[in-house]
Amino acid sequence: MATSASSHLNKGIKQMYMNLPQGEKIQLMYIWVDGTGEGLRCKTRTLDCDPKCVEELPEWNFDGSSTFQSEGSNSDMYLHPVAMFRDPFRRDPNKLVFCEVFKYNRKPAETNLRHSCKRIMDMVSSQHPWFGMEQEYTLMGTDGHPFGWPSNGFPGPQGPYYCGVGADKAYGRDIVEAHYRACLYAGIKITGTNAEVMPAQWEFQIGPCEGIRMGDHLWVARFILHRVCEDFGVIATFDPKPIPGNWNGAGCHTNFSTKAMREENGLRCIEEAIDKLSKRHQYHIRAYDPKGGLDNARRLTGFHETSNINDFSAGVANRSASIRIPRIVGQEKKGYFEDRRPSANCDPYAVTEAIVRTCLLNETGDEPFQYKN
């Protein structure tokens, strides 16, 4: 399996320099979503003092013509800091800074889906919407071949790999453990991880996060995963169906609840929300992957623990349904539900915004409602 040239550099030499004191200066790594809606970019600047909150961080800019976000003749784009985390790569006191992107005219960039999501979340803040997202991904070599798979064939069929233990069942656990610890250090609300059904496929869970913070934490957790994989010389792909055939795809199952759903007899509110979702299936399918449903069409086939992309379904403990109500929620008659439709490469801001629009703002139809300022 091919690994990157950078991973073969002597990391001990690098560490010699990383151990040097940096005085009172702080390194800030600014992170943003590029024009593909899936890729992440980053660059670093120096600050003279340790920022106490994100509001103390300066705005910055970058060349949008090199990130698929603007034309070369008017390429300046603005980075507006919105979330700050500890830097697990350079360590304290350095920071990771997640940013919204704005165009030269101060309007949000086309892939700045956070801007709209924040407005929608503010409208329903009194209902305290909580989200938890289960991010699946697949480890690949730089040649596009799944990590640990035979070079001229396939591993044994699915069955022993989910939550598996052993060198013949778990492929790439070092990367998973490094990512988990880096997220904990950074302050990401990571709550777990496990090996998935397909070999070299893994999952981590983020949440519960309230409102806009769901997207912030998941995007930065993705960034940390890419950086960890960079050090190991491999690639993490969020492609929802990286290997065609009789292999599981990769999703980003999204758990949702409100204060009312979490209280006694909240199951009634859950059932009402599911009924609203059932009447707006195509709107959600379009919101649940960056290509308006085309990526998910490869994954949501009705097989491999998925629903069919053309049909809406719901059930208790049913992993082949669009919406799953966990069995314990059915027993306790309160809690949350799981939307199993979002793809692994979804934008969490688009997913959470769509759920709130339908379930809490009672929107109907195939297009989002345009609210006045």
UniProtKB/Swiss-Prot annotation:
Give expression by tissue.
Answer: In the adult liver, expression is restricted to a small population of hepatocytes which form only a small rim of one to three hepatocytes around the central veins. Expressed in lung microvascular endothelial cells.
User: Matching InterPro entries, A to Z?
Assistant: Gln_synt_N, Gln_synt_N_sf, Gln_synth/guanido_kin_cat_dom, Gln_synth_cat_dom, Gln_synth_gly_rich_site, Gln_synth_N_conserv_site, Glutamine_Synthetase
N6-acetyllysine occurs at K11, K14
- Topology in the lipid bilayer: Lipid-anchor
Q: Where is the GS beta-grasp domain?
A: 24-106
Which residues make up the binding site for Mn(2+) 1?
E134, H253, E338
Post-translational modifications: Palmitoylated; undergoes autopalmitoylation.
Q: Which positions bind ADP?
A: Y336, F337, E338
How is this protein's activity kept under control? Glutamine synthetase activity is inhibited by methionine sulfoximine (MSO).
The PTM Phosphotyrosine maps to Y104
Q: Where is the GS catalytic domain?
A: 113-373
How is this protein annotated for GO cellular component?
A: axon terminus; cell body; cell projection; cytoplasm; cytosol; endoplasmic reticulum; glial cell projection; mitochondrion
Please name one Pfam family that this protein belongs to: Gln-synt_C
Q: Name a single GO biological process.
A: ribosome biogenesis
Q: Which UniProt keywords apply?
A: Acetylation, Angiogenesis, ATP-binding, Cell membrane, Cytoplasm, Endoplasmic reticulum, Ligase, Lipoprotein, Magnesium, Manganese, Membrane, Metal-binding, Microsome, Mitochondrion, Nucleotide-binding, Palmitate, Phosphoprotein, Transferase, Ubl conjugation
N-acetylalanine modification sites are A2
| Record: residues binding L-glutamate | N246, W247, R319, R340
Positions binding ATP in this chain are E134, E203, F204, Q205, I206, G207, P208, N255, F256, S257, R319, R324
Query: What is the protein's quaternary organization?
Result: Decamer; composed of two pentamers. Interacts with PALMD. Interacts with RHOJ. Interacts with BEST2; this interaction tethers a fraction of GLUL to the membrane, causing a decrease of cytosolic glutamine synthase (GS) activity and inhibits the chloride channel activity of BEST2 by affecting the gating at the aperture in the absence of intracellular glutamate.
**Could you say which protein family the record assigns here?**
Belongs to the glutamine synthetase family.
What is this protein's name? Glutamine synthetase
The upper taxonomy is:
Eukaryota, Metazoa, Chordata, Craniata, Vertebrata
